Every structure is written in C-alpha cells, then in structure tokens.
Amino acid sequence: MGSLKRRFKSWRDRKRGRRHRLQDMRAAPGFNLMTLGSDYGAWVFHDDGTLQGCTVFSAGLGEDASFDVEFASRYGARVVLIDPTPRAMAHHREILARVGQGAEVPYVNGGCQPATAYALDKIDVRQLPLEPFALWTQATRLRFFLPSNAEHVSHSLVNFQNDYRKDSDHIEVDSCRIDDLLVRYGIAPDELALLKLDIEGAEVEVLEDMMDKGIRPRQICVEFDELNKPCRTAFERVDRADRALNDAGYRCIYGNGTTDYLYLRDA
C-alpha cells in the first residue's frame, strides 16, 4: 500500500510540475553499483572492473572531497579536481597538507568536511591535482554567481539559485573546456573512465557541448542541481541534457530520487 501511495504521489507531483520524470529513476538491475563518500558527498558509480589506475575528472569540489579521496585511494586513480571557488581551493590546500596521514575524525553531517576526516595514508599528491577553473563550453572569463545562502560554498555560472538573474552578487573566474583538459592530461575523447559533474546548473551546457564534440566518458555522474528548484525552465533544461546523453548512446542506470544520476555509455 505504501508503494502504491508513493507512486500516486509521484504521478500527482509530475502532473503539477513539481517533479521531473527522472526523479522516479532508481537502480537498474544487472550493474555492479558502488557508493563512495560521506552521506553528503557520496556518489554512485558502476564498478566495471576497469577502474584500477584510471583517470577521473571531478568538477565541483566544494568542501567535501570524500568521494574523490575514497575513489583515488580504492582504485589508485588520478582524480582531477575542477573548481575555482576560493573556499574549494583552500580546502584542497588543506587536503594536500595532510597527504600520507590517516583519518583522525569521522565525517561530519553536511557539506563542510574537516581535512582530518579524510583517509589520505594511501594517497599521493599527484593523484589529486586541482584545476582552478569553472568547467564550461569555452575558455574565457565569466561571472560566477554567489549562492543565495552566504553559508553555502557552491557558486553558479547559470545562477539558477537566484532565478537565473544576471545582476546578483558574483565573482569573476576563468573557465576551461573539457577538451582542453583531456589534451592536458593525455586522455582520448572516449577514454575518460568517469566524469563527475556537480557544477550548479552548468552541467546542461557542458554535457550538450561534450556530446556535440564526440567526448564520451565511459560513465557520467551528474547532479542536475536545478531540480532543487522545480520550474518549467529547470525541467526543460534537464530534458535537454538527458536527451543529448540518450542520443549519444548513454543510458541512465541510477537515480537517487532527487538530483543525482548515473549515465553509462553503451559498449
């Protein structure tokens, strides 16, 4: 009965424009889904047996690197962090200062982890390089809009947090293209093992640009942040990204019911 009520509520919310169709997605069967990271910073991915020693691009560091650190430690991977936010860059410096040391305290609730919570005893500094740029469709100088809550760390290029306004408080940052990063790290367009996108709305333009250019990571973890503020514009933008991925041969194999999704490229 509970399941029937949930399905009815989901249908009703979609009819009222409160819920996107993707938010009914859960785990597809037949995949080796793994979860790494804190309660706040966790991501789900498919362990397909090819991740040992791989390279990951992780856009949107913030102040919770739990997924990135755990992934780098578990797979001996290089996790390229991409974030120009001042607080994120400061957090990265704190992490590097503790490389080689184990965790001293448990993860805290929320998205601001102390560096002492990370198990860095199996990490080399070369595994966690930081690119201090905003991931975008071109390399330029852009407005990076502040969150509506000053306590939050995440800035946005599209400013969905402030109703897509162009005149709210912002800083200016340099942006970069994913194709330039692939060249810098010597990775072919179809050889990136995993891409994580937590970039506050800019994922729509970035994903469309990637698909247009034939850039095909094996799997993509993406947060469609705009689903946190449901409206027609947000739903249309998420539809654009989902359609671009589907047309390029990706399948959504996991959703957490709110904003986080995992897309896997067809073999």
Task: Enumerate the language-model features and the residues they cover.
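Phosphate/nucleotide-binding beta-alpha loop and adjacent structural elements of enzyme active sites
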Residues: 1-267
